[in-house]
Amino acid sequence: MAAIVVPDRPTPLGELRPTLALAVPVVLTELGWMVMGVVDTIMVGPLGPEAIGAVGLGNILFFMVNTFGYGVLLGLDTLVSQAFGAGKLEECHRSMAQGVYLSLALAIPSMAACWVVTSWLPALGIDPAIAGPTRPYMHALSYSFLPLFGFVALRRYLQAMNVVRSVLVALVTANLINWGANWVLIYGHLGLPRLGIAGSGWSTVIGRTWMVGFLAVAAILHDRRTDGGLWRADLRPDWRRMRTLIGLGLPAAAYLALEIGVFTLAAVFAARLGVAALAGHEMALQLASVTFMVPLGVSTAGAVRVGQAIGRGDLPGAGRAGWMAIAVGLAFASGSALMFVCLPRSLLSIYTTDPAVLSIGATLLAIAAVFQLFDATQVIAAGDLRGAGDTRTPMLCNLVVHWFVGLPVGYLMAFTLGKGVVGLWLGLSTGLILGGLVLMGAWARRARRWRAEAGSQPAT
């Protein structure tokens, strides 16, 4: 067996600095990603609660369809970060190329699936006042799959090589474009026709097209500055590498699909409880999702740093990188939980002043405050495991805690016990809490094993 690199143990501050250097831009990128959906919701707010519910439901359904393609491309985190840690830049470029080819192959079936999902809305018992406007919004949004998947492939490639600022700039500028396009297309300014909710969907398409174009140019310019050898690499389709990428990505896609699928069904259940319940559910969920973007971004930083450490043969360093990512995420989650408890109505008033919706949303934010720490733990631990090449453990965890515990308990409390949308959220939070505990345990076992292996091997 090859000797394991055992460097001097860095101080906690020494671990924190590189984690934050990577995590902060990635977190801001994740927030920028979420802001695009928030902007859509805010911009249609004057159209009424039905419009808020329709855009919220449409975004959840879109991301349910999007999850498979997005998740498969997460395999690039493992391949590129480990190759970069080992100093094999050509391997990074070749993996990126396979990701781009795969993104092209995934876009068309994803678009078709989006249209099929919209045809199911009446059969799912969705209020016609919500189902009607949801359909044109999703139809427009479906055209963003191709630029979206291309952006994801380029983003994972650049981030795994510690290139994060270009990704952040792409998101910030795309949000500005999306905001302006919403103003023009929803309400018919500058002489263009008033498209209503559909205009919000088309605005997002425009923003995502800008993102992939910006990132493609950024990748080329970065390679020229660093003489990274992108144009000298063999970028032809590589079926062996493609199979490896898919093998890593499919469980990651299933992990995401299982969680997003639960919240998609939760939105459907909330819609059956009435317009006010759905609006409160969507606003509270969107606020919780905004704060979730921080640990989600930290999880990417954890995956990259763990993968890079493994690539250079530093298993103890991989363990320390993963634990530092979890610590950073928990610190933030503590603050967001406190904010939800202390300022619920102030946060919800961004969306609406409807008293019934505010009351429901405030109660749901109190529940969200409880599961913040566990939700942060589960997503960051899953990222750490992904950096190590383990995408199956998080997938199996999500299957059990969400589909065999969280959703059944939520449905029972909401409909059988008559607790409504509050009962639904209590069930979902149970699954999130269990998921955090299970994945924390899985990561702890792996980190202990690495320490033991390092202690039994000669240092180099």
Could you say what each language-model-derived stretch is?
Residues 1-26, 80-146, 177-184, 192-250, ...:
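Short alpha-helical transmembrane segments in multi-pass integral membrane proteins
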Residues 21, 44-63, 129-133, 197-198, ...:
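Interfacial/gating helices of multi-pass transporter permease domains
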Residues 21-40, 140, 151, 174, ...:
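Transmembrane helical elements of multi-pass membrane transporters/channels
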Residues 30-34, 67, 107, 111, ...:
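Residue-level hotspots within the lipid-embedded alpha helices of multi-pass solute transporters
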Residues 31-53, 122-128, 184-195, 253, ...:
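Helix-terminus/linker motif at the lipid-water interface of multi-pass membrane proteins
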Residues 38-42, 119-120, 153-157, 180-187, ...:
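Alpha-helical transmembrane segments of multipass membrane proteins
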Residues 52-115, 151-162, 166-167, 280-343, ...:
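Small-residue-rich hydrophobic transmembrane alpha-helices
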Residues 73, 77, 141-159, 167-175, ...:
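Short runs within selected transmembrane alpha-helices of multi-pass transporters and secretion channels
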